[in-house]
């Protein structure tokens, strides 16, 4: 009886692994670009909040 329970767990795990392998996002952005955009927005907000341009 424990053999049947163990088989069910393995097939469930295998299905989850297959789902994660097939799940691909259509938007692909390099991590460097995400960091660059984030830092740019932070600098822009800092400049706008503290008025360093004038």
Swiss-Prot record:
GO annotations under biological process? protein transport
All ranges on the Extracellular side of the membrane: 53-54
One GO cellular component term noted in the UniProt record for this chain: plasma membrane
The family database entries (InterPro entries) matched by this protein are listed as:
Preprot_translocase_SecG, SecG/Sec61-beta/Sbh
Task: Provide Cytoplasmic-side residue ranges.
Answer: 1-30
Top-level taxon: Archaea
Q: Where are the transmembrane segments?
A: 31-52
Q: Topology with regard to the membrane?
A: Single-pass membrane protein
Compartment annotation: Cell membrane
For this UniProt record, the keywords arranged alphabetically read as follows: Cell membrane, Membrane, Protein transport, Translocation, Transmembrane, Transmembrane helix, Transport
Function of the protein: Involved in protein export. The function of the beta subunit is unknown, but it may be involved in stabilization of the trimeric complex.
Oligomeric and partner information:
Component of the protein translocase complex. Heterotrimer consisting of alpha (SecY), beta (SecG) and gamma (SecE) subunits. Can form oligomers of the heterotrimer.
Similarity field = Belongs to the SEC61-beta family.
Which HAMAP family does the record cross-reference, listed alphabetically?
SecG
This protein is called what?
A: Preprotein translocase subunit SecG
This chain's source organism reads Methanococcus aeolicus (strain ATCC BAA-1280 / DSM 17508 / OCM 812 / Nankai-3)
Mind giving the lineage of the organism this protein is from? Archaea, Methanobacteriati, Methanobacteriota, Methanomada group, Methanococci
């Amino acid at each position: 009886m424990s053999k049947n329970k163990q088989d069910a767990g393995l097939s469930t795990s295998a299905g989850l692994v297959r789902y994660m392998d097939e799940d691909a996002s259509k938007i692909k952005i390099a991590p460097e670009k995400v960091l660059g955009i984030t830092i740019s927005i932070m600098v822009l907000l800092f400049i706008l909040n503290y008025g360093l341009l004038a």
